[in-house]
Amino acid sequence: LGATQTTDALAAHAREQIGRLARAVDTAWPSILVAHAALSDAVLSGTERTASLGRDPALSTRAFARSEFDYVALGHIHRYQNLNTEGAPPVVYAGSIERVDFGEENEPKGFVLVQIDDARSPRATSIRFVTTPARRFVTIEARIPVGGDSTAIIVDAIDRHDIKDAIVRAFYQGDAEDVAPPDTPSLRSALKDAAHVALIARRAATPAKVRRAPITEEMNLAQAV
Protein backbone atom coordinates (compact mmCIF):
# COMPACT_ATOMS: atom_id res chain seq x y z
CA LEU A 1 0.00 0.00 0.00
CA GLY A 2 1.07 3.56 -0.61
CA ALA A 3 1.21 6.19 2.12
CA THR A 4 -2.30 7.50 1.43
CA GLN A 5 -3.84 4.03 1.27
CA THR A 6 -2.09 3.08 4.52
CA THR A 7 -3.39 6.10 6.46
CA ASP A 8 -6.90 5.55 5.03
CA ALA A 9 -6.80 1.91 6.15
CA LEU A 10 -5.62 2.92 9.63
CA ALA A 11 -8.43 5.48 9.90
CA ALA A 12 -11.03 2.90 8.87
CA HIS A 13 -9.64 0.43 11.40
CA ALA A 14 -9.71 3.07 14.15
CA ARG A 15 -13.35 3.92 13.40
CA GLU A 16 -14.24 0.23 13.55
CA GLN A 17 -12.52 -0.11 16.92
CA ILE A 18 -14.31 2.95 18.32
CA GLY A 19 -17.62 1.46 17.22
CA ARG A 20 -16.74 -1.89 18.79
CA LEU A 21 -15.85 -0.21 22.10
CA ALA A 22 -19.05 1.84 22.03
CA ARG A 23 -21.19 -1.26 21.52
CA ALA A 24 -19.45 -2.96 24.44
CA VAL A 25 -20.21 -0.14 26.91
CA ASP A 26 -22.29 -1.06 29.97
CA THR A 27 -24.47 2.05 30.23
CA ALA A 28 -25.08 1.34 33.91
CA TRP A 29 -21.62 2.76 34.56
CA PRO A 30 -19.86 5.96 33.50
CA SER A 31 -17.64 5.36 30.48
CA ILE A 32 -14.57 7.23 29.26
CA LEU A 33 -12.88 6.69 25.92
CA VAL A 34 -9.15 7.42 25.92
CA ALA A 35 -7.23 7.80 22.66
CA HIS A 36 -3.95 9.11 21.34
CA ALA A 37 -4.88 10.49 17.94
CA ALA A 38 -4.77 13.60 15.75
CA LEU A 39 -8.30 14.61 14.84
CA SER A 40 -8.64 16.38 11.51
CA ASP A 41 -10.62 19.29 12.98
CA ALA A 42 -8.26 19.97 15.89
CA VAL A 43 -6.37 23.27 16.08
CA LEU A 44 -2.63 22.66 15.83
CA SER A 45 0.18 24.64 17.41
CA GLY A 46 3.65 25.62 16.22
CA THR A 47 5.60 22.83 14.57
CA GLU A 48 2.60 20.48 14.82
CA ARG A 49 1.22 22.21 11.71
CA THR A 50 4.01 20.78 9.57
CA ALA A 51 4.99 17.68 11.55
CA SER A 52 1.48 16.20 11.35
CA LEU A 53 0.72 17.16 7.77
CA GLY A 54 -0.30 14.08 5.82
CA ARG A 55 1.07 11.60 8.35
CA ASP A 56 -1.88 10.89 10.64
CA PRO A 57 -5.06 8.97 9.83
CA ALA A 58 -7.95 11.33 9.06
CA LEU A 59 -10.28 10.94 12.05
CA SER A 60 -13.06 13.42 12.77
CA THR A 61 -14.72 14.48 16.01
CA ARG A 62 -17.89 12.72 14.86
CA ALA A 63 -16.13 9.35 15.02
CA PHE A 64 -15.41 9.87 18.74
CA ALA A 65 -18.51 11.79 19.87
CA ARG A 66 -20.58 8.67 20.52
CA SER A 67 -23.45 8.92 23.00
CA GLU A 68 -22.30 5.70 24.66
CA PHE A 69 -19.34 7.58 26.13
CA ASP A 70 -19.57 10.16 28.91
CA TYR A 71 -16.19 11.70 28.15
CA VAL A 72 -13.54 11.37 25.45
CA ALA A 73 -9.98 12.10 26.62
CA LEU A 74 -7.54 12.72 23.78
CA GLY A 75 -3.79 13.04 23.67
CA HIS A 76 -1.34 14.07 20.92
CA ILE A 77 -2.26 17.72 20.15
CA HIS A 78 -0.52 20.23 22.43
CA ARG A 79 -3.30 22.85 22.63
CA TYR A 80 -6.17 22.50 25.11
CA GLN A 81 -9.50 22.31 23.28
CA ASN A 82 -12.95 20.79 23.44
CA LEU A 83 -13.95 19.71 19.95
CA ASN A 84 -17.58 19.00 20.85
CA THR A 85 -18.71 22.11 22.71
CA GLU A 86 -22.23 21.99 21.28
CA GLY A 87 -22.97 18.40 22.22
CA ALA A 88 -22.15 15.42 24.37
CA PRO A 89 -19.83 13.86 25.22
CA PRO A 90 -17.02 16.41 25.53
CA VAL A 91 -14.19 15.45 23.16
CA VAL A 92 -11.18 17.06 24.80
CA TYR A 93 -7.48 17.50 24.27
CA ALA A 94 -6.03 18.45 27.65
CA GLY A 95 -2.91 19.55 25.79
CA SER A 96 0.70 19.37 26.89
CA ILE A 97 1.81 20.59 30.30
CA GLU A 98 4.94 22.18 28.79
CA ARG A 99 5.54 24.39 25.77
CA VAL A 100 7.82 22.88 23.15
CA ASP A 101 8.32 25.77 20.71
CA PHE A 102 7.52 29.43 20.11
CA GLY A 103 4.29 28.51 18.35
CA GLU A 104 2.94 27.75 21.84
CA GLU A 105 4.33 30.94 23.39
CA ASN A 106 0.95 32.41 24.32
CA GLU A 107 -0.97 29.20 25.00
CA PRO A 108 -2.00 28.38 28.58
CA LYS A 109 -0.92 24.97 29.86
CA GLY A 110 -2.57 22.78 32.45
CA PHE A 111 -4.91 19.84 32.95
CA VAL A 112 -8.63 19.12 32.66
CA LEU A 113 -10.76 18.39 35.72
CA VAL A 114 -13.69 16.20 34.69
CA GLN A 115 -16.84 15.58 36.71
CA ILE A 116 -19.46 13.04 35.62
CA ASP A 117 -22.77 13.46 37.42
CA ASP A 118 -24.07 9.92 37.74
CA ALA A 119 -27.20 11.05 39.60
CA ARG A 120 -28.73 12.55 36.46
CA SER A 121 -30.26 10.72 33.55
CA PRO A 122 -28.72 11.02 31.08
CA ARG A 123 -25.45 11.65 32.86
CA ALA A 124 -24.05 15.17 32.72
CA THR A 125 -20.33 15.75 32.23
CA SER A 126 -18.67 19.02 33.19
CA ILE A 127 -15.08 19.99 32.50
CA ARG A 128 -12.77 22.67 33.83
CA PHE A 129 -9.34 23.58 32.51
CA VAL A 130 -6.90 24.22 35.36
CA THR A 131 -3.77 26.16 34.41
CA THR A 132 -0.39 25.15 35.80
CA PRO A 133 3.06 26.79 35.65
CA ALA A 134 4.92 26.07 32.42
CA ARG A 135 8.22 27.01 30.83
CA ARG A 136 7.90 30.49 29.33
CA PHE A 137 8.85 31.33 25.76
CA VAL A 138 9.54 35.02 25.11
CA THR A 139 9.90 36.78 21.76
CA ILE A 140 11.59 40.20 21.77
CA GLU A 141 11.16 42.64 18.88
CA ALA A 142 13.22 45.80 18.31
CA ARG A 143 13.06 48.36 15.53
CA ILE A 144 16.21 50.31 14.67
CA PRO A 145 15.57 53.79 13.25
CA VAL A 146 17.91 55.39 10.74
CA GLY A 147 21.11 56.30 12.58
CA GLY A 148 20.05 54.46 15.73
CA ASP A 149 22.40 52.52 17.99
CA SER A 150 21.24 48.97 17.26
CA THR A 151 22.92 47.44 20.31
CA ALA A 152 21.50 49.96 22.78
CA ILE A 153 18.00 49.77 21.28
CA ILE A 154 17.90 45.97 21.39
CA VAL A 155 19.26 45.89 24.95
CA ASP A 156 16.54 48.35 25.94
CA ALA A 157 13.92 46.07 24.38
CA ILE A 158 15.36 43.11 26.29
CA ASP A 159 15.21 45.03 29.56
CA ARG A 160 11.48 45.61 29.07
CA HIS A 161 10.78 41.87 29.17
CA ASP A 162 10.85 39.37 32.02
CA ILE A 163 13.30 36.84 30.64
CA LYS A 164 14.36 35.08 33.83
CA ASP A 165 14.42 31.31 33.27
CA ALA A 166 12.65 31.72 29.91
CA ILE A 167 13.45 30.44 26.42
CA VAL A 168 14.14 33.64 24.48
CA ARG A 169 14.51 34.75 20.90
CA ALA A 170 15.26 38.31 19.80
CA PHE A 171 14.54 39.93 16.45
CA TYR A 172 15.49 43.36 15.20
CA GLN A 173 14.51 45.21 12.05
CA GLY A 174 16.13 48.31 10.62
CA ASP A 175 14.51 51.23 8.86
CA ALA A 176 17.67 51.54 6.77
CA GLU A 177 19.26 48.91 4.54
CA ASP A 178 22.69 49.50 6.08
CA VAL A 179 21.70 49.25 9.76
CA ALA A 180 24.78 48.40 11.80
CA PRO A 181 24.72 44.88 13.24
CA PRO A 182 24.48 44.80 17.05
CA ASP A 183 27.30 43.73 19.32
CA THR A 184 26.46 40.10 20.01
CA PRO A 185 28.44 39.77 23.29
CA SER A 186 26.54 42.77 24.68
CA LEU A 187 23.22 41.18 23.74
CA ARG A 188 24.26 37.86 25.27
CA SER A 189 25.16 39.68 28.47
CA ALA A 190 21.75 41.38 28.54
CA LEU A 191 20.13 37.96 28.07
CA LYS A 192 22.15 36.20 30.77
CA ASP A 193 19.10 35.56 33.00
CA ALA A 194 17.34 33.57 30.28
CA ALA A 195 17.35 29.80 30.55
CA HIS A 196 18.26 29.57 26.88
CA VAL A 197 18.74 32.01 24.00
CA ALA A 198 17.32 30.33 20.93
CA LEU A 199 17.99 33.03 18.36
CA ILE A 200 19.21 36.57 17.78
CA ALA A 201 18.45 37.60 14.21
CA ARG A 202 17.52 40.43 11.89
CA ARG A 203 14.08 40.24 10.34
CA ALA A 204 13.92 40.71 6.60
CA ALA A 205 12.20 43.93 5.62
CA THR A 206 8.66 43.51 4.35
CA PRO A 207 8.50 44.69 0.72
CA ALA A 208 6.33 47.76 0.35
CA LYS A 209 3.19 47.22 -1.68
CA VAL A 210 3.20 49.23 -4.87
CA ARG A 211 -0.20 50.48 -5.90
CA ARG A 212 -0.82 49.82 -9.56
CA ALA A 213 -1.99 52.65 -11.75
CA PRO A 214 -5.66 52.34 -12.70
CA ILE A 215 -6.56 50.97 -16.10
CA THR A 216 -9.45 52.62 -17.91
CA GLU A 217 -11.53 51.61 -20.91
CA GLU A 218 -10.13 54.53 -22.89
CA MET A 219 -6.56 53.20 -22.76
CA ASN A 220 -5.07 51.24 -25.63
CA LEU A 221 -3.01 48.11 -24.99
CA ALA A 222 0.33 49.95 -24.90
CA GLN A 223 -0.97 52.48 -22.37
CA ALA A 224 -2.48 49.80 -20.14
CA VAL A 225 0.75 47.82 -20.05
Could you tell me what each predicted segment is?
Residues 1-92:
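His/Asp/Glu-rich metal-coordinating catalytic cores
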Residues 8-15, 101-105, 177-181:
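Active-site glycine- and acidic-residue-rich loops that bind
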Residues 21, 101, 156-159:
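Generic recognition of flexible, low-complexity loop/linker segments
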Residues 36, 96, 175:
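Cofactor-binding loop segments of dinucleotide-utilizing enzymes, especially the Rossmann-like FAD-
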Residues 55-60, 96, 100-102, 189-199:
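Gly/Ser/Thr-rich active-site loops/lids in small-molecule metabolic enzymes
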Residues 62, 69-147:
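A conserved active-site cap/scaffold subdomain adjacent to cofactor or substrate pockets
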Residues 116-225:
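Accessory, non-catalytic peripheral segments of nucleic-acid enzymes
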